[in-house]
Regions:
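Thioredoxin-like thiol-disulfide oxidoreductase module
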Residues: 102-156
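C-terminal motif of bacterial Sec signal peptides marking the signal peptidase cleavage site
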Residues: 15-18
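Positively charged n-region of N-terminal signal peptides that target proteins for export
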Residues: 1-5
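Short active-site neighborhood of thiol/selenol oxidoreductases, capturing the structured segment around
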Residues: 63-75, 87
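A short beta-strand-turn-helix
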Residues: 48-67
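Bacterial signal peptide processing site
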Residues: 20-22
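Non-catalytic, surface beta->alpha helical segment in thiol-disulfide oxidoreductase systems
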Residues: 138-206, 210-211
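Typically the conserved alpha-helix immediately C-terminal to a functionally engaged Cys/Sec
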Residues: 81-94
């Protein structure tokens, strides 16, 4: 056997070995996230922030089966821009992460998916309040900013403060007084801490339901 052939065989064995070793399998949400940084779209966010992008196929998985925090918004929304840094402050304080998805794009580009997500949210809604709004045709409308707190496939809480505000009436910077910022962060802190604890508990059990713990 010549030297070149022997080298090729050894390389093949090493490559095969690398594929069959005990590699950790990513969770549903972790495999769906990308490496983009949200501060490219949300200009008030620092580069080191607590958000990760969730692809379309991971959104329903997180809502129906996961444990985590899902932020729905879109960068053209001034209220979403103003909300994100406040949520980020709370997430960082709790060493937690939040998934981000721009559902607004799907309203025009993939209405079937948009409607399905709206239905999913209400189907697992344990908050006691209706999260969705409805237009004159009876179609669900997801008003944003909206942050969902999901625990084992149930929406246990949400926050959508300012989702109905009109920036032509009041600007976000005028609305968000220091008192309102403090009240929001107090409310969010309790919920973020609860989800973080649930994620750790699931991880300790060998969580395989789409939860994410960093």
């Amino acid at each position: 056997m010549n030297k070149k052939m022997m080298t090729g065989i050894l390389a093949g064995i090493l490559l095969l070995g690398g594929c069959t070793q005990n590699a950790a399998q990513p969770t549903a949400s972790a495999s769906a996230e990308t490496e983009k940084n949200l501060n490219a779209e949300y200009t008030q966010l620092p580069e080191e922030n607590a958000f990760y992008y969730l692809e379309k196929d991971g959104v329903e998985t997180l809502i129906l089966h996961g444990t985590g925090i899902l932020y729905l918004g879109f960068p053209e929304c001034p209220w979403c821009q103003a909300y994100v840094p406040q949520l980020n402050t709370v997430l960082l304080a709790n060493e937690a992460k939040a998934a981000y998805y721009n559902i607004h794009t799907d309203k025009s580009e993939d209405r079937t998916f948009y409607d399905q997500i709206a239905k999913d949210i209400e189907d697992v809604n344990d908050t006691g309040n209706t999260i969705m709004q409805y237009d004159n045709d009876g179609k669900a409308v997801i008003y944003m900013p909206l942050v969902l707190f999901v625990k084992n496939g149930r929406v246990i809480a949400y926050n959508n403060e300012t989702c109905m505000e009109d920036s032509s009436v009041i600007k976000p910077e005028a609305y968000w007084t220091e008192e309102k910022k403090s009240a929001l962060q107090t409310a969010l802190n309790k919920l973020v801490a609860e989800i973080k604890t649930a994620q750790k508990e699931n991880e300790a059990k060998g969580c395989d339901n789409g939860c994410k713990v960093d």
